[in-house]
Amino acid sequence: MAFLKKSLFLVLFLGLVSLSICEEEKRENEDEEEQEDEEQSEEKRASWKVFLKNIGKAAGKAVLNSVTDMVNQGEQ
């Protein structure tokens, strides 16, 4: 009977250890996925910044050209 108890405790202990290791690996994988998601969102933000900057430049040039044309027409 004592042998059976020791065997059962050993099996339970090894099961808990393996479960603990699996949980730790799962947490590490989740952390890596979160970091990848953060990197992707940063890349998206950077691309949006560039896009909006280019739109701003184009709009500014268009307004400047319009104003310049109006001024030139007024001088004539």
Curated annotation (Swiss-Prot):
Main location: secreted
Signal sequence, renumbered to the chain: 1-22
PTM annotation (Glutamine amide): residues: Q73
Keywords, alphabetical: Amidation, Amphibian defense peptide, Antibiotic, Antimicrobial, Cleavage on pair of basic residues, Cytolysis, Fungicide, Hemolysis, Immunity, Innate immunity, Membrane, Secreted, Signal, Target cell membrane, Target membrane
UniProt-listed GO biological process terms: defense response to bacterium; defense response to fungus; innate immune response; killing of cells of another organism
Tissue: Expressed by the skin glands.
Bias-annotated ranges (Acidic residues): 30-41
Localization terms from the record: Secreted; Target cell membrane
Region (Disordered): 24-44
Propeptide: 23-45, 74-76
Keyword 4Fe-4S: no
Task of the protein: Antimicrobial peptide with activity against Gram-positive and Gram-negative bacteria and fungi. Has been tested against E.coli (MIC=2.68-8 uM), S.aureus (ATCC 25923, MIC=2.68-8 uM), S.aureus (ATCC oxacillin resistant, MIC=2.68 uM), K.pneumoniae (MIC=10.71 uM) and C.albicans (MIC=10.71-32 uM). Probably acts by disturbing membrane functions with its alpha-helical amphipathic structure. May penetrate bacterial membranes, but stay at the mammalian membrane surface. Shows a very weak hemolytic activity.
Name the record gives this protein: Dermaseptin-SP2
Gene source species: Agalychnis spurrelli
